[in-house]
């Protein structure tokens, strides 16, 4: 039987939601092993002068706990 733990993270990008999601996994993987999935809870974009300047995701990352 495996155990899975979930952490909540926020990540951003100036290029898009896909890159923000990839940044979330990349940063989490620096300290967490065995990442299995990412669930995007919220997405938002910051706007300045009628243009999107950054994208952000609030996500849950699931990873398997080693025994």
Predicted regions and their residues:
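Structural motif
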Residues: 4, 38, 54-58
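A cross-kingdom feature marking charged/low-complexity
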Residues: 44-67
């Amino acid at each position: 039987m495996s155990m899975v733990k979930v952490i909540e993270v926020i990540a951003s990008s100036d290029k898009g939601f896909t890159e923000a999601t990839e940044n979330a996994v990349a940063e989490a993987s620096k300290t967490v092993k065995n990442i299995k999935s990412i669930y995007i809870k919220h997405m938002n974009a910051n706007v300045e002068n009628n243009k999107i300047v950054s994208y952000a995701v609030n996500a849950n990352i699931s990873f398997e706990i080693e025994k």
